């Protein structure tokens, strides 16, 4: 086959793929219809010598024909307000949307499969802050304390998204993602040089489980989580707490008499505290004796005069009479 014949064949196949993709798009069908037996028979009847387009060729044509959309908001992107992302950067952004915006992980997986990974620049500021907003941190000053507690979740979602491509997750991928994620998180909150080594060790701990040739992280579904909780609750032992007994006073303070005090003193003696009781009694008797021995000393007659049973100070008029 000469060069011109090969060119005509390639153009014919290209036109076939384009027309078939338009037909599938307008009819709302899926690209997998090219694998149906009835379609293959119909296509072979029209032109037995023409090659049948494959599903990847149809999907690629559909992507080229459809406008490029942002992987974050899904809106059409413009060349001056959007950037093309690598798989690593796109995975990090999609991971942030899954964790911070409660995005469906399956939707993030579908986005990462696109050939054109573009994102609007207007989302970058919110994407950078979503990790801290999710932890309800007031400012970015203490952000470096929060990133280590969230790094494990990022690793799990990132691994799930990347593994959806069917690629083997190697140590090189772990190191690559680690460097990108650390630079991504270090954008907020300056770390002192004396603390950087210590905090880097905490960051390294988040990747210990990922640092292997084949990393498989199981994402538990809500049903599995509920089953795990019920399994845990079965092992719990129910403990019945008995109410604490409280005793109320039968008498108020005003109801106590001297006889009650004597009775309580006798009980104390019977219970093995005779020495303490005797000391208390001696001290009480001593106070009584001192009070009875004290006599009222009337003031000197020079300054006071006795009037109707009590002593009153002498006034100036009384001094004159005297």
From Swiss-Prot:
Disruption phenotype: Greatly reduced nuclear accumulation of lin-15a protein but no effect on mRNA levels.
Biased composition (Basic and acidic residues): 275-304
Pfam family, one: Lin-15B
Keyword Nucleus: yes
GO biological process: positive regulation of gene expression; protein localization to nucleus; protein stabilization; regulation of translation; vulval development
Region Disordered, residue ranges: 264-322
Tissue expression as described in the entry: Widely expressed throughout embryonic development. Expressed in the six multipotent ventral ectodermal blast cells, P3.p-P8.p, which generate the vulva and in their descendants throughout vulval development.
GO CC annotation terms, alphabetical: nucleus
Annotated keywords: Nucleus, Translation regulation
Location(s), subcellular: Nucleus
Record's function text: Required for translation, stability and/or localization of lin-15a.
Entry protein name: Protein lin-56
Organism: Caenorhabditis elegans
Taxonomy of the source species: Eukaryota, Metazoa, Ecdysozoa, Nematoda, Chromadorea
Gene that specifies this protein: lin-56
